[in-house]
């Protein structure tokens, strides 16, 4: 009974008085909006919503709306094949894994203990090369209870020495209770360096340890090199599955069963700010691996997944925005069912992360796990028409990538022949074009830059020596190189390169394009000089001290004034005059155009060169 004494109905049919929604009605509304905005040509005869469809780098179509008509086949249950909804039946969140790569064992130990005392639950240690020496592993792990905080190694070429050093630290822990990952990954070594590395020693080490340490994993199939080379999600998945198959083959040759071999593997993936693709990638990966282990003669296996926030998406400029990127990526990795997640500190692209950035990275995971209750429901995205369709489409695309690699003799042969490099280069070319045109925007760098930001200073990372392996890209680098040139100019001349915004007409008619031009030029480190509404833009240009001008106004004001103002600007000393708008042959004296979808990198590079900025 309610307080008024009435009885509540068992079924509140709140929508009973409304007509049943129909797709056709929604399509008519979409058509009206698109037609009003000029995006729908009168002669267009397809479904209007098709103009809102986008494509991933794998060619997967993303529809603007998914309905019950798009319902996919049931994905099963967590802990059961095909493991789309999770490899673990209990779904108890994920392992908060922190990365340490400091070569100083004392400094590494201080950071390790600080992480473990403040929310981290496992450690990922880079060993060898410019990172921690295998012999220093004991000092770095001093005071760490290895039965409570598992260690995952990334040992590079020194995996045998690193493995022996870590195994020595397990003294006092029952052999059957030793957990962790030794991290041997000869396939990734080849991808990183271009040099062949024999898989057999790692397989033999695995066979030796299998019976003694049943919970210890020894090999990692890592997708990060393919992601960082600019690859698509399906290309990353296909290469990782192919690496996993290569390890299955060599492990079974060493005497392990398919099931025992599969239990020795861990898989690493990039988590990006594209949350739905990250969720779908992790779900699709488990489905693919279950299929591989099943057809290989074993039982369908779940996949031990380690998700790492993407280094490719990190920026050096306005690095605080990286906190937002890594939060979204961590959210997606958790929802996608990763067993362990590493959130890279926001300053990881600048230098050695400091205590503050490490704390923020840890707390990002703590908030999502504890405050947001993200782990309270297993696979919360499961059943979403969009997510399920995207998972299926990505799994199919990745399987095609995997079979192409297998057709060429497997991952080692495909790397050696250049097939993998060429496939990744094709995708990077497409991605680079979208980055340059800002169709893939980078907030704080290519869009909404903050020219007056104070640089974040960090201890430098070891210099990377280019090798013969896969390239490593960071999406913001081309724009950041322009900003570096601007900074050098500022240091030498006391001011930044400038562009005068020659505003035409009243404020209302020029503001939109003036704001667009201002945002664009700042992305290249060029300071915009905006005089506001002026009666004589040529006179204002003379007083500005700028050498390049950009007309900003409405199409109507361009038709009436652009040619005369451009001529006046050239007479006043402008060495180049650009126009904020689409190119047109009707304009005279215009040396370049800046508009939505233009090659912003080309416009900015050309402008800096015109201004003599080295």
What would you call each of these model-derived segments?
Residues 348-349, 384-389, 501-507, 538, ...:
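A short beta-alpha structural unit
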Residues 2-28, 37-39, 48-54, 58-84, ...:
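Intrinsic disorder at enzyme termini
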Residues 26, 30, 137, 166, ...:
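Generic structural signal of hydrophobic/aromatic residues within well-ordered alpha-helices
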């Amino acid at each position: 009974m309610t307080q008024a004494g009435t009885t509540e109905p068992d079924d509140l049919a709140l929508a009973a008085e409304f007509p049943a929604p129909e797709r056709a009605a929604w399509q008519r509304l979409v058509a009206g909006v698109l037609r009003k905005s000029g995006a729908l040509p009168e002669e267009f005869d397809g479904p209007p919503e098709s103009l809102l469809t986008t494509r991933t780098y794998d060619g997967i179509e993303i529809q603007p709306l998914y309905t019950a008509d798009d319902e996919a086949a049931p994905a099963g249950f967590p802990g059961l094949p095909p493991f789309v909804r999770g490899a673990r039946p209990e779904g108890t969140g994920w392992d908060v894994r922190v990365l340490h790569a400091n070569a100083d064992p004392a400094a590494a130990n201080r950071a390790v203990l600080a992480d473990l005392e403040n929310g981290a639950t496992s450690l990922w240690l880079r060993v060898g090369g410019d990172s921690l020496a295998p012999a220093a592993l004991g000092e770095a792990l001093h005071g760490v209870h290895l039965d409570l905080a598992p260690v995952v190694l990334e040992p590079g070429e020194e995996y045998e020495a690193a493995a022996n050093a870590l195994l020595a630290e397990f003294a006092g822990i029952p052999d059957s209770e030793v957990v962790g990952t030794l991290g041997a990954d000869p396939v990734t070594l080849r991808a990183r360096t271009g040099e062949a590395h024999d898989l057999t020693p790692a397989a033999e080490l695995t066979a030796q340890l299998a019976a003694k340490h049943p919970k210890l994993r020894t090999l990692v199939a890592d997708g990060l090199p393919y992601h960082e080379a600019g690859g698509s999600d399906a290309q990353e998945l296909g290469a990782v599955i192919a690496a996993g198959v290569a390890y299955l083959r060599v492990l079974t040759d060493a005497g392990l069963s398919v099931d025992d071999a599969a239990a020795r593997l861990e898989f690493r993936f990039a988590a990006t700010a594209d949350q739905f693709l990250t969720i779908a990638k992790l779900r699709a990966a488990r489905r693919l691996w279950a299929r591989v282990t099943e057809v290989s003669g074993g039982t369908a296996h779940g996949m031990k997944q380690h998700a790492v926030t993407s280094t490719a998406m990190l920026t050096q400029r306005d690095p605080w925005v990286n906190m937002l990127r890594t939060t979204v990526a961590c959210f997606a990795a958790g929802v996608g069912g990763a067993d362990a997640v590493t959130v890279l500190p926001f300053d990881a692209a600048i230098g050695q992360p400091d205590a503050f950035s490490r704390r923020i990275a840890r707390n990002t995971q703590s908030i999502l796990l504890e405050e947001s209750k993200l782990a309270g429901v297993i696979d919360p995205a499961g059943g979403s028409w969009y997510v399920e369709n995207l998972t299926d489409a990505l799994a199919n695309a990745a399987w095609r990538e995997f079979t192409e690699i297998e057709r060429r003799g497997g991952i080692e042969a495909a790397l050696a022949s250049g097939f993998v490099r060429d496939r990744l280069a094709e995708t990077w070319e497409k991605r680079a074009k979208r980055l340059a045109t800002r169709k893939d925007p980078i907030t704080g760098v290519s869009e909404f830059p903050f020219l007056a930001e104070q640089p974040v200073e960090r201890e430098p990372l070891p210099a990377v020596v280019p090798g013969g392996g896969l390239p490593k890209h960071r999406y913001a680098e081309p724009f950041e190189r322009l900003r570096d040139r601007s900074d050098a100019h500022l240091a030498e001349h006391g001011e930044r390169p400038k562009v005068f915004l020659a505003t035409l007409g009243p404020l209302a008619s020029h503001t939109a394009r003036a704001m667009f031009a201002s945002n664009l030029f700042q992305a290249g480190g060029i300071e915009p000089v905006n005089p506001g509404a002026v009666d004589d833009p040529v006179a204002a240009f003379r007083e500005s001290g700028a050498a390049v001008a950009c007309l900003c106004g409405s199409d109507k004001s361009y038709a009436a004034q652009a040619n005369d103002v451009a001529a006046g600007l050239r007479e006043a000393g402008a060495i180049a005059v650009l126009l904020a708008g689409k190119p047109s042959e009707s304009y005279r004296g215009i040396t370049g155009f800046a508009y939505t979808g233009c090659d912003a990198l080309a416009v900015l590079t050309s402008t800096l060169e015109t201004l003599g900025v080295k």
